[in-house]
Amino acid sequence: MKKAIHFQSQPVVFNCASCNSNFTIDSTAKQKDLAIDICGKCHPFYIGQLTKQTVHGRAEKLSQKFNAGKAFLENKTKKSNQAKVEKQTRHRSINEL
């Protein structure tokens, strides 16, 4: 075996940011303390609390965006048409003329 090419293993403390648990593992990391976002004690997959999400494809997402845009434009034109009709049908008094 060649010398000075092998990784140096040392005990490293991993700190979970979600559940504040600490555990020590032999690792080749150079830091003595490492912060991780989530661990096996608090990850939903490992504790059995998975939430089912509906996954849509790209085409379905795009069509939903277009449908939402069409609905917005239809509501906008209806409101502007109603405002025009109200403006035309409003009777003016002599003082307003």
From Swiss-Prot:
Residues 75-97 are annotated as: Disordered. The gene is rpmE. Binds the 23S rRNA. GO terms for molecular function: rRNA binding; structural constituent of ribosome. It comes from Mycoplasma genitalium (strain ATCC 33530 / DSM 19775 / NCTC 10195 / G37) (Mycoplasmoides genitalium). Part of the 50S ribosomal subunit. GO terms for biological process: translation. One of its GO terms (cellular component) is ribonucleoprotein complex. NCBIfam families: L31 (TIGR00105), PRK00019.1 (NF000612). Keywords: Ribonucleoprotein, Ribosomal protein, RNA-binding, rRNA-binding. InterPro entries: Ribosomal_bL28/bL31-like_sf (IPR034704), Ribosomal_bL31 (IPR002150), Ribosomal_bL31_A (IPR027491), Ribosomal_bL31_sf (IPR042105). This is Large ribosomal subunit protein bL31. Belongs to the bacterial ribosomal protein bL31 family. Type A subfamily. Residues 84-97 have a biased composition (Basic and acidic residues). The lineage of its organism: Bacteria, Bacillati, Mycoplasmatota, Mycoplasmoidales, Mycoplasmoidaceae.
